[in-house]
Amino acid sequence: MTLHPDLALPSPEDFEQLSPEALAARMNGPEGQGLPGTLGARLGIRYVSMARERVVATMPVEGNRQPAGRLHGGATLALAEELASVGSWLNLDPQRQVAVGVDLNGTHVRGVSEGHVTAEARLSYRGRSLMVWEIEMKDEKGRTTSLCRCTCNVISMGA
């Protein structure tokens, strides 16, 4: 298993030298458009802040709607898993381990038809082989739109 060639995950030194916002800018890629060829880039996900126990990103509604004109639930869940996976990676040795989503659920409590959503993922459990993240999405008015939970499995790169 190899990571995306343009992906420059933060090193332990980066956490001491860079702010959560600077780490997020690194994940947004050199053009600020996300990492080419990834689902996150296609969905328009942009990182705002990244830390080992909290990751924040935004995603536009435009381009991610279902036929009725609202934000697609699948796009919302993809955003949740993206943040949980990246947040998990921040807690690993990226040369030896990777984290992948193995369980994901979400409850959509309010529809969104314009603007963007902001997602905040918080680490709620960290074990040797599993990490569990709680992700809350809000609209531009600060109203909760979805509540999600994602479990990531930690695996060795050679596995």
Swiss-Prot record:
Disulfide bonds: none
Gene Ontology molecular function: 1,4-dihydroxy-2-naphthoyl-CoA thioesterase activity
First-tier enzyme category under EC: hydrolase
A Pfam cross-reference name: 4HBT
EC number of the protein: 3.1.2.-
UniProt key word Hydrolase: yes
GO cellular component, one term: cytosol
Statement: the UniProt record of this protein carries the keyword Transmembrane: no
Keywords: Hydrolase
Family: Belongs to the thioesterase PaaI family.
PANTHER family: 1,4-DIHYDROXY-2-NAPHTHOYL-COA THIOESTERASE 1
Protein name per the record: Putative esterase DR_2406
Source organism of the structure: Deinococcus radiodurans (strain ATCC 13939 / DSM 20539 / JCM 16871 / CCUG 27074 / LMG 4051 / NBRC 15346 / NCIMB 9279 / VKM B-1422 / R1)
Source organism phylogeny: Bacteria, Thermotogati, Deinococcota, Deinococci, Deinococcales
